[in-house]
Design a protein with these regions (language model features):
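Structural motif
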Residues: 16-18, 54, 94-96, 124-127, ...
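Active-site beta-loop-alpha junctions enriched in small/polar residues
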Residues: 73-77, 101-103, 131-136, 166-169, ...
Length: 565
């Protein structure tokens, strides 16, 4: 569209859509004004009194900028981007800032290209931060490795904003040349941080390196400390990490400024989105905690656009893009209608092109033969154990007196199961076995190729036979999730795209997901949290306190391996 055409349309009031009788949220003046909003093609040309051939009567509903998820891994939804869009857009999200490091860890640059192509023509605006840590650390094996040179091919792309979450803070602080090369490449662009519990001089060094945001704060004190360094704080409500209520209440109570705060989901399963909402759920929680509704709207939209330099997005004003959301109120944030980035009402019936994917993202489960001898874990009577913490990604390192057989090998008992991580990209045979507390299952096993961030195969169970069957079940289907009990596969979700995603219809995926959860609950898993997503983070060595990689039990606080014997 020519600039002169837009200027004339704005001057003459010529429009392609008018939203009438709306309570318009102005993020610049912190006001709510009863007005009409005129749109020409995909741009807002005015807020005032308008009429046109194509009108939507808001009937006094609140009109807000389309919501922005400031940090998300689309692959964690387990469905392709067009299916993901159909789940989140009805909840008012019109823009996501995606970090495709899940598929990049499996398929490298080919995976990034695939995600870029799959999102090119969607009504959902999908912007990208390029994965900075593939693999996340040098303490595990992933399917690919990305260095600064690999990223240069993407720098010119219009939807690439900056560098994705820098999880390996240790490499930053120690001035790893490989990490410095990436930071220099993105010196003039946003660089996302990922630094749980980092403080003091370490945090100072991390900020000096260029990290400008963090989505890993779990306490009010951490939020305030990082905010004071100039960081943007992304308040996350995901499926596994869902502990923001108390933090938001303190923010409201202490009247901490929210202008550098925004919302994200990071990793949220589609059934949770359908049940709870997406970014509108973050806004709902914020208002319930005492945050001013207009501030909550800004945290859900404008703040992220401003921080990431997304021009013309995040506000309802002349010259801004026309993606907007009509809300019944500013308490529950129930969505009445969504206007997409194309300046048209989103119906969910839009025809999407068939996904075309490169061969590199298929047949990604490559395993050697695994036997029960590979699953044996020799240990002392007092053994290190990974203790899961409900609703959090962090774990606790504890020592427990465990049962052992005549060979000194761990026998699952007393709420503790065996956990194994197996390299699944190149059939190297690299694998490690550990002990996990808190999963709660008995007489069975669960396996997954969704295992952040290297996405090796992770399997947990209280007996070797079911663990082996779960492993073979995923080898056969090209990756996904599998639950086994007493030699029977109770449920399996094939994820043939990089072992992470499927092109199957969302309802089919939800049905199988529920079958997986029901199977795990029947085996004793706790119903107050999602055991599938919790398990998928047990191999992520950049989140404290202890995790298991294919190389061994890793102390994520002191960055060293812990031996069992």
């Amino acid at each position: 569209m020519r600039q002169s055409e837009l200027i004339r349309a704005a001057y003459e009031g010529k429009n392609t859509l008018v939203i009438k009788n709306a309570n318009v949220v102005n993020v610049f003046t912190d006001e709510i004004v009863r007005a009409d909003v005129a749109v020409y093609e995909d741009v807002i040309i005015g807020v005032g009194s308008y009429s046109g051939e194509n009108e939507i009567d808001a009937g006094g509903a609140y009109l807000a900028p389309g919501f922005i998820d400031a940090h998300v891994h689309i692959e964690s939804s387990m469905v392709i981007p067009s299916s993901f869009m159909k789940v989140i857009m009805p909840h008012g999200t019109t823009t996501v800032i995606a970090d495709p490091h899940e598929i990049a860890n499996v398929a490298g640059a080919a995976g990034i290209r695939a995600m870029y192509k799959l999102t090119d023509e969607l009504p959902l605006r999908v912007l990208f931060m390029l994965p900075s840590c593939v693999p996340a650390t040098p303490f595990e094996h992933s399917g690919a490795k990305l260095v600064a040179e690999d990223m240069e091919q993407f720098m010119h792309k219009s939807r690439v904003l900056g560098l994705g979450e820098v999880m390996d803070a240790n490499s930053v602080i120690n001035c790893s040349q490989e990490m410095l090369d990436k930071l220099r490449l993105f010196d003039k662009r946003p660089i996302d941080g990922h630094a749980p519990m980092l403080e003091g001089m370490g945090l100072n060094a991390y900020r000096v390196a260029g990290a400008f945001s963090d989505h890993e704060c779990s306490t009010y004190e951490e939020v305030k400390q990082k905010l004071a360094t100039g960081m943007n704080i992304l308040l996350r409500i995901g499926s596994a990490a869902n502990n923001m209520d108390g933090v938001l209440r303190r923010i409201a109570k202490e009247k901490l400024p929210t202008r550098n705060m925004m919302f994200c989901t990071d990793d949220k399963h589609i059934e949770d989105i359908r049940r709870e909402g997406h970014i509108n759920a973050n806004a709902r929680m914020a208002v319930a905690a005492g945050i001013d509704p207009i501030d909550a709207i800004k945290m859900a939209s404008y703040n992220a656009a401003r921080a990431y330099g997304i021009r013309g997005v995040g506000a309802i004003a002349p010259g801004y893009k026309a993606d907007m959301v009509l809300l019944e109120d500013l308490k529950d944030f129930k969505v009445k209608q969504v206007i997409s980035r194309f300046g048209r009402p989103y119906t969910g019936e839009e025809q999407m092109p068939s996904p075309i994917l490169p061969p590199q993202v298929f047949n990604s489960v490559r395993l050697p033969e695994i036997s029960k001898y590979d699953l044996a874990l020799r240990c002392h009577v007092s053994a290190p154990v990974i203790k899961m913490i409900p609703h959090q990604l962090v774990t606790e390192l504890v020592y427990r007196d465990v049962e052992r057989d005549e060979n000194g090998c761990f026998i699952p008992s007393e709420g503790m199961v065996k956990l194994a991580v197996i390299e699944r990209h190149h059939a190297t045979g690299s694998m490690a076995v550990g002990i996990l507390e808190g999963l709660g299952i008995k007489h069975g096993a669960v396996a997954s190729t969704v295992a952040h961030d290297s996405h090796n195969l992770v399997v947990a169970g209280d007996n070797d036979e079911d663990m082996l069957m779960a492993i073979e079940s995923l080898r056969d289907c090209g990756g996904g999730y599998s639950v086994v009990s007493r030699g029977v596969v109770l449920a399996r979700l094939p994820l043939p795209i990089a072992g992470l995603m499927t092109a199957a219809p969302v309802n089919d995926v939800l049905e199988i997901q529920q079958a997986l959860l029901d199977a795990l609950y029947s085996l004793g898993a706790k119903r107050d949290s999602d055991p599938l997503i919790a398990l998928s983070f047990m191999a992520l060595p950049v989140i404290p306190a202890v995790k298991l990689t294919d190389e061994g039990l890793f102390d994520a606080v002191n960055f060293k391996f812990i031996k069992y014997n």
